[in-house]
């Protein structure tokens, strides 16, 4: 009997389910056009065999561990934030259990999401207005009107002030935002991401209700949080997420990376390789910059697919939400940082200060350093994100 050809190469056949790439079936590639994967030598063991086992980099690993200690909040700050979040959550759950005590809106459930839940929170950069924050998704049974959200904020502020000492009441403030509510208490903040049940989305009016796209985004945050809890459990993943978040807040070119994209990129870099073992933080960090530099999120690239999209019908490539200028800025910024990492790793990771390498030619650790330049500008992208067909046409023009 003729043996059937294995679908995957031998090194991928026994891969655990959580390490599978989130890619649609190969037939989907033909339907989408000439999209392609970026160069990644770790997934090409036949052409680029490893000369040695991937162990921790003796130079980069101590620098990464030192930076992680600087980015991690102190035990006192973490306890204070957890105490503040617990108080807010208790007040919200009280409204869930006794809906008749508050008639402006009815709460269905409250869920923890974000960096504080996943233990990947970092200290805000010096001089920024940011605070240590925790996120809670509040799902309403009723429609999220602006008036109801404001009344919910006033009720929470009143209930919290009843438990505070007189000197603590002045620190508590609450304000309405485009995503819901923000409760601030000195150097800490709790963001309430308001949304409603999916059955109510089609009835939302942007003039009186919270924006429909924002409601969907806040609701999807609960799915993302569950996925991260179940899949991103390796310590290297949490370390890489912290490092990427730190790079994003220090370098303007990495701002297009949102938290969900950072989690997917970190998971891909740590787990998706030619073995069943996870990469150490030093190699995973360099691999993240290498993939971004190779054009992982440029037009025509397969990029990273959303695990919650329908892969059989309409697989969603996450980088298509960016404008072409943002995609180009993300690529050339990563290329510049990757070259700087080889010259002065302590500067890239934030351990030591140095010149602004994106301002122009400079001396970096005794080496003349010239940054990469953009090839797409704002007037060319018009500030609009490109869909898959538009990005495919741009890909064809570049390669023609």
Label the predicted regions.
Residues 1-132, 138-155, 169-173, 178-182, ...:
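N-terminal regions immediately upstream of nucleotidyltransferase
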Residues 1-3, 12-22, 101, 133, ...:
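Intrinsic structural disorder
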Residues 5, 33-35, 221, 254, ...:
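Generic detection of intrinsically disordered/low-complexity segments and helix-coil linkers/edges
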Residues 9, 30, 40-42, 49, ...:
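Compositionally biased, low-structure terminal segments
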Residues 15, 21-36, 234, 250, ...:
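Compositionally biased, intrinsically disordered low-complexity segments enriched
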Residues 78-81, 85-86, 215-230, 325, ...:
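Charged, low-complexity, helix-prone segments enriched in Lys/Glu/Asp/Gln
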Residues 86, 93, 146-306:
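Catalytic cores of NTP-dependent nucleotidyl/adenyl transfer enzymes across multiple folds
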Residues 259, 263-400:
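Pol beta-like nucleotidyltransferase catalytic core
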């Amino acid at each position: 009997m003729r043996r059937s050809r294995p679908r995957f190469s031998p090194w991928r056949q026994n891969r655990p389910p959580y390490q599978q790439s989130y890619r649609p079936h190969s037939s989907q590639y033909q339907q989408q056009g000439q999209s392609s994967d970026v160069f990644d030598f770790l997934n090409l063991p036949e052409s680029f065999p490893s000369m040695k086992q991937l162990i921790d980099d003796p130079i980069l690993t101590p620098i990464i561990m030192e930076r992680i200690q600087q980015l991690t909040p102190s035990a006192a700050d973490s306890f204070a934030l957890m105490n503040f979040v617990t108080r807010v959550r208790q007040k919200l759950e009280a409204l869930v259990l006794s809906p008749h005590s508050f008639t402006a809106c009815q709460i269905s459930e409250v869920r923890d999401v974000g960096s504080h839940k996943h233990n990947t929170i970092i200290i805000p950069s010096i001089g920024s207005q940011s605070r240590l924050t925790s996120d809670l998704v509040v799902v309403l049974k009723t429609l999220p009107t602006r008036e109801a959200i404001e009344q919910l904020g006033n009720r929470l502020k009143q209930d919290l002030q009843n438990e505070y000492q007189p000197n603590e009441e002045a620190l508590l403030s609450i304000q309405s935002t485009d995503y819901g509510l923000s409760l601030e208490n000195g150097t800490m903040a709790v963001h309430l991401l308001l949304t409603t049940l999916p059955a109510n989305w089609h009835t939302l009016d942007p003039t009186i209700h919270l924006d429909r796209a924002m409601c969907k985004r806040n609701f999807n945050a609960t799915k993302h949080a569950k996925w991260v809890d179940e899949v991103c459990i390796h310590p290297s993943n949490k370390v890489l997420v912290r490092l990427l978040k730190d790079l994003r807040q220090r370098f303007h070119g990495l701002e297009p990376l949102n938290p969900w994209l950072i989690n997917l990129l970190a998971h891909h870099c740590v787990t998706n390789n030619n073995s069943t073992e996870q990469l150490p933080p030093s190699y995973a960090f360099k691999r993240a910059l290498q993939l971004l530099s190779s054009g992982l999120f440029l037009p025509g690239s397969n990029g990273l697919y959303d695990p919650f999209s329908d892969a059989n019908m309409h697989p969603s490539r996450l980088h298509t939400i960016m404008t072409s200028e943002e995609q180009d800025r993300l690529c050339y910024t990563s290329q510049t940082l990757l070259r700087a990492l080889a010259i002065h790793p302590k500067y890239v990771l934030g351990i030591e200060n140095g010149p602004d390498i994106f301002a122009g030619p400079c001396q970096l650790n005794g080496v003349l350093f010239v940054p990469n330049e953009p090839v797409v500008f704002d007037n060319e992208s018009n500030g609009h994100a490109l869909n898959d067909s538009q990005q495919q046409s741009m890909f064809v023009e570049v390669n023609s």
